C-alpha cells in the first residue's frame, strides 16, 4: 500500500503505478509514518488493517515454460501473458489444459483472475520487460501464535510504537495482479513473521514471502 495523504491510504491497484518505491538494501530500512489503526477482532480484515503491498519482478525459466506444441520455449519474454499451474508456465490457457492436465472447463483467455485461481491457475502479464507478482503483508501488533485463529489486537497499529518488517524469504509466487479483495487477516500467509512488541521500541517482524 502507499501513503495517499496523512490520513488514509489506498491500494496500488495497477502494476504500472508510478509510486511503487524500491526496497532498501539488505541490512537497511526505509521508513514511513502511518496513523494509529485499531479495531475490534471481527473487523480485523484486509479493508481495515494496515499493511504493506510488495511488488516483485521475475523472468521464468525457459525450460519450465511450455508452448502450444508441448515443448519448452526458447524465450519466455517474447510472450505478453503466461499461465502458471503446478510449478510450470504455459503460453496459452489451452496449453495448461492439454499439457498440464489442468481442468480448464468453462475457462477462456478472458476469464477473470478469480475464475482462474479457483482452478489453481495464475495469469501473469508482462510489464516493463518482465513479469510481476504481488504480496500483501498485514502488520501485527500482538501475535497469538496461532495462524488460524484471530487474536484480540493481533493486527493493528498502536501509537508510540515502531514496526519493523524484515523479509527473510520468498516461498512461492504471489498473484499476477494486486490482491485487493476482502479477506480475514488470518488467512493463508504470504509472509512468515517473527517480531517483538515493545513501547517506543522497534517491533521487528521477519517476513517470508510465500
Segments predicted by a language model, with ranges:
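C-terminal functional modules
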Residues: 154, 159, 175-210
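Tryptophan-paired
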Residues: 4-159, 209
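Short Gly/Pro-enriched loop/turn and capping motifs at secondary-structure junctions
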Residues: 172
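Short Pro-Gly-centered flexible turn/kink motifs
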Residues: 159-165
Amino acid at each position: 500500500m502507499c501513503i495517499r495523504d496523512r490520513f488514509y491510504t489506498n491500494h496500488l491497484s495497477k502494476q504500472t503505478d508510478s509510486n511503487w518505491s524500491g526496497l532498501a538494501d539488505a541490512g537497511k530500512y526505509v521508513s514511513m509514518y502511518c496513523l494509529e489503526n485499531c479495531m475490534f477482532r471481527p473487523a480485523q480484515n484486509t479493508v481495515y488493517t494496515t499493511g504493506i503491498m510488495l511488488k516483485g519482478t521475475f523472468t521464468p525459466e525457459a525450460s519450465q515454460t511450455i508452448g502450444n506444441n508441448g515443448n519448452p520455449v526458447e524465450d519466455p519474454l517474447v510472450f505478453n501473458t503466461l499461465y502458471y499451474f503446478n510449478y510450470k508456465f504455459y503460453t496459452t490457457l489451452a496449453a495448461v489444459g492439454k499439457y498440464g492436465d489442468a481442468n480448464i472447463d468453462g475457462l477462456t483467455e478472458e476469464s477473470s483472475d478469480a475464475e482462474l485461481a479457483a482452478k489453481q491457475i495464475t495469469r501473469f502479464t508482462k510489464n516493463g520487460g518482465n513479469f510481476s507478482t504481488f504480496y500483501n503483508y498485514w502488520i501485527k501488533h500482538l501475535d497469538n501464535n496461532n495462524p488460524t485463529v484471530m487474536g484480540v489486537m493481533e493486527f493493528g497499529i498502536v501509537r508510540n510504537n515502531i514496526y519493523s518488517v524484515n523479509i527473510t524469504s520468498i516461498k512461492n509466487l504471489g498473484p499476477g495482479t494486486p490482491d485487493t479483495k476482502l479477506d480475514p487477516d488470518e488467512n493463508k500467509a504470504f509472509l512468515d513473521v517473527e517480531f517483538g512488541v515493545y513501547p517506543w521500541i522497534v517491533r521487528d517482524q521477519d517476513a517470508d514471502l510465500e
